[in-house]
Regions:
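Conserved alpha/beta enzyme-core scaffold
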Residues: 1-131
Length: 131
C-alpha cells in the first residue's frame, strides 16, 4: 500500500498555480503551516482557499496569492472582506451542510452534488439550476 504521508517537499511539488486546494484550518489552529509557508516561498499564486488574516491560509490571502474562495464565511478575515469588496477576490459562499457534501462528493470522485438549498433566493443567482 502506498503511504499517504509525504514530506513537505513532496507535498509542495504537487501544488501549482491556479489549483483548488482544501485546507483544514479552524481559526488558524489546524493549518498546514509548513505547506503554506512553502507555498509562499515558491511563489505559488491564484489559489482557491480561505482562512484568518495572519494565520494559516490567511497568509496566502494577505499576500494576494488567492484568486477565489469557496467558503461558508469570511467573518474572521478582514483582509478577505476588503479584497472581496475591492473586486480582487471572488468569493462563493456555500451553506455549511452543502459545503460538507461538496467535500464528500469531491473525495468520492463525484462531479458534484445537487441540493435545493438557496433556490428562489440571492444564492441561486448565477448558479446552474436543474429542474
Amino acid at each position: 500500500m502506498k503511504s499517504k504521508v509525504v514530506t513537505r517537499e513532496e507535498a509542495l511539488s504537487r501544488i501549482h498555480d491556479g489549483q483548488t486546494i482544501m485546507f483544514g484550518d479552524w481559526h488558524g489552529e489546524f493549518a498546514a503551516d509548513e505547506i503554506i509557508d512553502g507555498m509562499l516561498e515558491k511563489g505559488i499564486k491564484d489559489i482557491v482557499s480561505a482562512g484568518m488574516a495572519d494565520q494559516g491560509v490567511g497568509k496566502l490571502i494577505k499576500d494576494h496569492r488567492v484568486k477565489s474562495l469557496i467558503t461558508t464565511h469570511i467573518g474572521l478575515n478582514p483582509i478577505a472582506k476588503d479584497q472581496m469588496f475591492a473586486g480582487e477576490l471572488a468569493i462563493e459562499f456555500s451553506p455549511q451542510g452543502t459545503f460538507a457534501e461538496r467535500i464528500r462528493c469531491g473525495g468520492a470522485g463525484l462531479g458534484g452534488c445537487l441540493t435545493p438549498t438557496g433556490l428562489g433566493t440571492e444564492v441561486e443567482e448565477g448558479k446552474q439550476k436543474l429542474t
